[in-house]
């Protein structure tokens, strides 16, 4: 690549505007010399936790964020430094660390990225749920808006054993997600998330099955919503969500190279052309990879390895 941004230039971009604006700049400018063979991949951004791998990294300084109590919202402002989160562009491999000192998880907790999406205005949003390995009460799910400044809200309306995940920024500007038990098991609720307070509210009466896990939300340009149902052995079914139907509409069993997909999906997104894309790996295989998904047959085609926890499509 002939036009590569320096660390200083990338850092200036990230601080001057939103994180996604910097990534969009990388996509539109730095990739102009080497467009992807598959245009659907150009705007895919991944997120993971841990140390940065590449040399192109920028650290966003400490910012003020507002946390809201999970049961009684308040206006208490505290200094929180979101760290341990790394953004990465699929097509360039360029990475960006979000902070560098205080972790989102406390000592004795493991940071679980339970949701990642892009809002209609381009702001990236991540849901994190610290998992405790001690007997103390774990920190509830947080949603962090990766803008300038970074803002973090504690999700309110969750029960002690619940977490919010599978975030989706809808075409009409809302933020929705799936609520289930912290171990990923039913019952599952489709909820709307207040962008100002973090409060959740149920938005429809779709009844999800009690013997399958539900994960991921994707909306295509035509407004159709998709998710996946995962059976006991990891068998994964693509389904459509229709507010006029009481149950999810089963479309197809997912498979790759003629083999039944057996490990659920990390992410499901829809490109501007209406192509469903999935992130995941078959059981006992690494790393994760991005796959195209045929909505009718369930056939998945491996496009590119991408060793991240979740993906979204950055919006300009």
Language-model segments: residues:
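Conserved beta-propeller blade signature
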Residues: 43-46, 124-125, 175-177, 225-227, ...
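Beta-propeller fold detector
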Residues: 96-103, 150-157, 201-207, 248-256, ...
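Residue-level detector of Asp-centered blade-edge/turn motifs that repeat once per structural unit
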Residues: 118-121, 170-172, 220-222, 270-273, ...
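Short loop/turn segments that connect beta-strands within beta-propeller blades
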Residues: 90-93, 144-148, 194-197, 242-246, ...
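C-terminal segment of N-terminal export signals and the immediately downstream linker at the start
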Residues: 4, 25-51
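Repeated scaffold domains used in trafficking and secretory/extracellular systems
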Residues: 107-116, 160-168, 210-217, 260-268, ...
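N-terminal secretory signal peptides and thylakoid transit peptides that target proteins
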Residues: 1-18
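Short glycine/acidic-enriched loop and turn motifs that connect beta-strands
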Residues: 51-55, 130-134, 181-185, 231-235, ...
């Amino acid at each position: 690549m002939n036009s590569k941004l320096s660390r200083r230039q990338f850092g200036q971009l990230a601080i001057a505007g939103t994180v996604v604006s910097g990534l969009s700049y990388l996509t539109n400018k730095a990739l102009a010399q080497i467009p992807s063979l598959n245009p659907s991949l150009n705007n895919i951004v991944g997120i993971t936790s841990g140390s940065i791998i590449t040399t192109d990294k920028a650290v966003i300084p400490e910012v003020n964020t507002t946390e809201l109590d999970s049961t009684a919202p308040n206006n208490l402002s505290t200094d929180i430094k979101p760290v341990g989160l790394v953004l990465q562009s699929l097509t360039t491999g360029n990475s960006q660390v979000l902070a560098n000192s205080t972790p989102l998880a406390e000592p004795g907790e493991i940071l679980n990225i339970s949701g990642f999406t892009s809002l209609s205005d381009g702001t990236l949003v991540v849901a994190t749920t610290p998992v405790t390995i001690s007997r103390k009460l774990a920190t509830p799910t947080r949603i962090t808006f990766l803008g300038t400044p970074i803002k973090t809200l504690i999700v309110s309306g969750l029960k002690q054993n619940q977490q919010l995940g599978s975030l989706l920024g809808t075409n009409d500007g809302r933020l929705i997600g799936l609520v289930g038990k912290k171990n990923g098991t039913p019952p599952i609720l489709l909820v709307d998330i207040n962008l100002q307070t973090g409060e959740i509210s149920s938005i429809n009466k779709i009844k999800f099955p009690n013997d399958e896990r539900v994960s991921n939300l994707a909306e295509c340009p035509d407004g159709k919503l998709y998710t996946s149902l995962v059976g006991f052995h990891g068998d994964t079914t693509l389904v459509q969500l229709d507010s006029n139907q009481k149950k999810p509409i089963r479309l197809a069993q997912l498979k790759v190279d003629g083999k039944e997909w057996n490990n659920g999906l990390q992410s499901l997104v829809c490109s501007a052309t209406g192509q469903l894309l999935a992130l995941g790996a078959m059981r006992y295989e690494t790393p994760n990879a991005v796959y195209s998904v045929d909505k009718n047959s369930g056939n998945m085609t491996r496009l590119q390895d991408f060793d991240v926890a979740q993906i979204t499509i950055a919006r300009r």
